[in-house]
Amino acid sequence: MTLLKNKKQLLEKQYIKKNTKKFNQVILALFSGGFATFSILYCVQSILPMFSKQFYLTPAESSLALSAATITMSLGMLFTGPLSDIIGRKSIMSTSLFIAAMLTMICSMMTSWISIVLLRALTGLALSGVVAVAMTYISEEIHPNSLSFCMGLYISGNTIGGFLGRLLSSILAEKFSWSISLMVIGLFSFISSCFFLYFLPPSKNFLSVSINFHKCLHRFYLQLKNRVLFFLFIIGFILMGSFVTIFNYIGYRLMLEPFFLCQSSIGLLSTIYLTGVYSSPKAGVLINKYNRNNILIVSLMLMIIGLFITQYNQLFIIILGLIIFSGGFFASHSTASSWVGSYSNIAKIQATSLYLFFYYLGSSVFGTFGGFFWFHMQWLGISVFIITMLFFGVFLSFKLKQKNFKNKYF
């Protein structure tokens, strides 16, 4: 009876199927949106030393240009998600993209550090309207058979956006100035936002609801109480925390003996992020064949293997280890995020918002806490810390595999 009911619901909903014109439009739109979002978010990372030099800042103070945006973005996702339940998915994503692009261009004209940090905080808040809602749009509008593949392509767009944002801003800042680099990133993002607005089909399976604060909190509570979703939230926390920590401190290692790499050479390590362009959609395809749980476990193990490989003091082998680690990370994130979207039958936006909240929270917590291990044991300490957390992620994945575990609450 339940199976017949689920089939009837699938027929009633107007899902977008793979290999159709609308599906291709969704891919182009979400790719453009992901590119704009993460190029704006990470464009300042490569020019933090320039901020330090111009405004006489310590590295910690300079990092506020990035951390101010990520903090407000993670917090904003808890509110912009439910807000989209009222005004619609496409409306809030389009508005958020245009606001973020405009704020980035305005930021390029600022001459005081406080103004830059404030504008970056507002930019992060605006971007939360895209990050929190895009995954929900995909899970609502894309046919379940194509959901994982589409989610993987969306994450690929995010990956390319983050990579090009870092690379382009670095080149333009060195050639001209940091303000020119931000202006160009803002203009490119504005154009990408236009593509997003034009190509993204309006929601067909979305029903507008009024905000009830108590009901909204209750929905968040239900998602946290659900064991499957809660474990996926923790896995997301571990994933992003591990990824950011490794790339935060690998530069310090490669500046030391026996490598002595310069800053520009270390900056090229961001090209490793492009492994996500392949591994994210590939994981989506493999999920339909081997199921999500198996793909998640294998992807986490790839991260662990990659990190073990980086223990060798040969540059080529370290880079190989980072490539394997990154490929496993993007495959894991694509798998876990699509799992959250498909598993949460009710309050999808709250489930997605919580996953992304934990995901970016892991970046802040691990990135800072990793400094303790670097100070005492350098790269070995970082590796032991991250490998331990990844094994905990594998443990949670095996717990999710237990048949008697499904659909249970704490």
Curated annotation (Swiss-Prot):
Instruction: Name which cysteines form disulfide bonds.
Output: none
Q: Sorted alphabetically, which keywords does the UniProt record give?
A: Cell membrane, Membrane, Transmembrane, Transmembrane helix, Transport
Highest taxon above the source species: Bacteria
Q: What stretches pass through the bilayer?
A: 27-47, 63-83, 97-117, 118-138, 145-165, 180-200, 228-248, 254-274, 293-313, 316-332, 355-375, 378-398
Give the way it sits in the membrane.
Multi-pass membrane protein
Q: Which GO terms describe its molecular function?
A: transmembrane transporter activity
InterPro entries, per database record? MFS, MFS_dom, MFS_trans_sf, Sugar_transporter_CS
Compartments in which it is found? Cell membrane
Supply one GO CC term from the record. Answer: plasma membrane
Database matches in Gene3D superfamilies: MFS general substrate transporter like domains (1.20.1250.20)
Please verify whether the record's keywords include Transferase. Answer: no
Please tell me whether the keyword Transport is annotated for this protein.
yes
Q: Which family does it belong to?
A: Belongs to the major facilitator superfamily.
The protein's name is: Uncharacterized transporter BU588
What organism, scientifically named, is this protein from?
Buchnera aphidicola subsp. Acyrthosiphon pisum (strain APS) (Acyrthosiphon pisum symbiotic bacterium)
List the top taxonomic levels of the source: Bacteria, Pseudomonadati, Pseudomonadota, Gammaproteobacteria, Enterobacterales
